[in-house]
């Protein structure tokens, strides 16, 4: 029964000091670029992302997000939604992957539109970010660390940690959900949008009676904890060990007031938290 993705879900939130509402509906191909822009903007002040872009081969967050949507929007094991305000503007989006669940129980809906000609998939069909990481052999990942720059070592460290964690939390035979992304436009953060998206996913997990896990940024973990997620593993990173240069006045000024704690001399430490939520009324 495909229940959640076929109906509009309404949430009350606080907008500009007064009560307002958002509607959560399935993502369409026409929404991809806007959602990718929201992702890129949201991560533009994340010091972990900034440091990783200082390598010899910096990545473009807009392109990474856009390509991820293109690869997974038509997959029946991935559900993507958008949060829309009363003016029709997208204020956030979220996605969930499903493991070990019968496809007829996954609340997936084919997009109402078709991908434009310029949105040809450039990522092999059937591979999301999490799944492609899970398919990488750990020994191969270790070999790739030879003769790499510090940023490349950081990427390799995180990739290996992700593979190890995924093998631990969802070995063959596991039934679960995992959050592939949950982003709120910066100007709408701390107004209930993120909580509404988390609750939407939680309701799906509760109906299916499965656990959900997430690889959380240093900024988002408190929000997940508020909605029932608990930390089961952490990866602590000394960003100054990997950064090829100090933040300097430029980045210190740009990140002032963001809560990132960057100084002119130090990027600081950053903690990636793996978090898990059990469904309500589970028997464990």
Q: Which role fits each region the language model picked out?
A:
Residues 168-174, 196-212:
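Conserved acyl-CoA
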Residues 184, 190-203, 226:
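Conserved acetyl-CoA-binding loop-helix of GNAT-fold acetyltransferases
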Residues 90, 95-183, 189, 236-274, ...:
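Conserved acyl-donor/pantetheine-binding loop and adjacent beta-alpha core of acyl/acetyltransferases
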Residues 23-37:
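A short beta-loop-alpha structural element at the N-terminal edge
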Residues 37-56, 71-72, 103:
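Helix-loop element at the rim of GNAT/NAT acetyltransferase active sites that forms part
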Residues 53-80, 85, 167-168:
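Active-site rim helix/loop that mediates acceptor-substrate recognition in acyltransferases
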Residues 195, 207-209, 218-238:
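Conserved active-site alpha-helix within GNAT-family acetyltransferase domains
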Residues 46-67, 108, 113-123, 128:
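Conserved GNAT-fold acetyl-CoA-binding loop/helix
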């Amino acid at each position: 029964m495909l229940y959640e993705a076929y109906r509009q879900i309404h949430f009350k939130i606080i907008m500009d000091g007064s009560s307002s509402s958002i509607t959560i509906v399935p993502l369409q191909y026409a929404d991809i670029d806007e959602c990718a822009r929201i992702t890129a903007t949201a991560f533009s002040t994340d010091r972990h992302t900034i440091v990783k872009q200082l390598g010899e081969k910096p990545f473009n967050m807009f392109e990474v997000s856009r390509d991820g949507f293109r690869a997974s929007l038509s997959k029946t094991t991935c559900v993507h939604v958008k949060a829309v305000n009363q003016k029709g503007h997208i204020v956030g989006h979220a996605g969930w992957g499903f493991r070990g669940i019968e496809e007829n129980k996954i609340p997936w809906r084919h997009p109402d539109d078709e991908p434009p000609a310029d949105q040809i998939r450039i990522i092999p069909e059937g591979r999301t970010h999490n799944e492609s990481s899970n398919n990488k052999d750990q020994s191969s990942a270790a070999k790739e660390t030879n003769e790499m720059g510090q940023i490349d070592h950081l990427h390799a460290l995180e990739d290996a940690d992700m593979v190890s964690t995924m093998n631990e939390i969802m070995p063959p035979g596991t039934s679960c959900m995992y959050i592939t992304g949950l982003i709120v436009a910066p100007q709408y953060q701390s107004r209930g949008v993120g909580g509404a998206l988390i609750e939407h996913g939680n309701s799906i997990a509760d109906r299916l009676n499965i656990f959900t896990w997430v690889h959380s940024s240093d900024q988002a973990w408190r929000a997940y904890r508020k909605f029932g997620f608990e930390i089961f593993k952490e990866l602590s990173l000394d960003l100054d060990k990997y950064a090829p240069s100090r933040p300097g006045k430029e980045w210190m000024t740009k990140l002032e007031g963001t809560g990132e704690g960057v100084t002119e001399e130090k990027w600081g430490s950053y903690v990636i938290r793996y978090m898990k939520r059990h469904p309500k009324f589970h028997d464990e």
